[in-house]
Amino acid sequence: MSGQTESLMILIAGPYRSGTGDVPSKLVANVQAMEEYALPLFRAGHVPIVGEWLALPLVELAGSTQIGDAAFNEIFHPIADRLLARCDAVLRIGGASQGADQMVASARQYGLQVFTQLQEIPGCAGIVEPID
């Protein structure tokens, strides 16, 4: 990253449950897809964040026994909204996702930048998308 590019805290938003049938291996794959974008963002000088990094440990500590139970719902989406209030931007990746779309809508309400490709992000010109 050049010294002229401002470092941004960027929330990487993509599908988590969508299209998985809540199958654990598919949920893990969706988190990994978001994580694939974290390293290029970091190397470009930004602070990448995936909401699941914060939400999932808290959901477990809250005693959730299955996705969508009361403990899960208490934490999973609300923490994303709290996190957004402290971010500079959102990178929306992947396919259909009501949750990720809600994060984008909230980001726009907060006046945050919303990106859909790495190349749109300052300092990321020429970086190949990890996942097409």
Give residue spans per PLM region.
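Catalytic phosphate/metal-binding cores of nucleic-acid and nucleotide-processing enzymes, i.e., regions
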Residues: 1-132
